[in-house]
């Protein structure tokens, strides 16, 4: 049996040094940036290298699942109420993009929240990294709102003060979801790429493109 550390190493293959440096000069973002910081399905398709014909956009954080291991909740998906809901949340936007309405061969999710203060955004980021301490190396069932259940194994590198990366792999498949969370000034942005094989480079490009629209 592989150790948890070995399993995490396998999950993280391809992630590497995917976190970009924080610019030396930055200013807080305006709430309106969420309207264009989430990329449209055409741009997403260019990044993942596959046609993406379906998308669903939301202006409120949503969670449509529950997990057996609560410590893995905030790694199971992005754009979650537990992370983003805050009295100082000024604006929010997210989008799910996939191959088609019935095909999730490639599935991408983006989420971004602009907060009234840097402290509020930092609190949201810590609701990701603090509440998932101990999830790396774990396997848990994920129960979806449609009644189906998936089983995922999780791995993640140690987060920094501003960046977190993690991977989950579906049981008995080569399907993995590569995820990044980036804290930039008063913004928390998240990106997730799910596919067979290595989606690490794609999620890094996606998160970088989202960040570039903010000028942060």
Regions found by a protein language model. Name each.
Residues 25-97:
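N-terminal "mature-domain start" segment
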Residues 192-216:
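Surface-exposed amphipathic alpha-helical segments
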Residues 1-26:
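Secretory targeting and sorting signals
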Residues 106-109, 173-179:
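Short, surface-exposed coil-to-beta transition loops
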Residues 94-125:
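A short acidic-to-branched-hydrophobic micro-motif
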Residues 51-53, 58-61, 66, 130-175:
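Short Gly/Thr-rich strand-loop-strand
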Residues 93-100, 176-184:
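Short, surface-exposed beta-strand/loop micro-motifs that present aromatic residues
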Residues 108-111, 182-195:
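Short, well-ordered beta-strand elements
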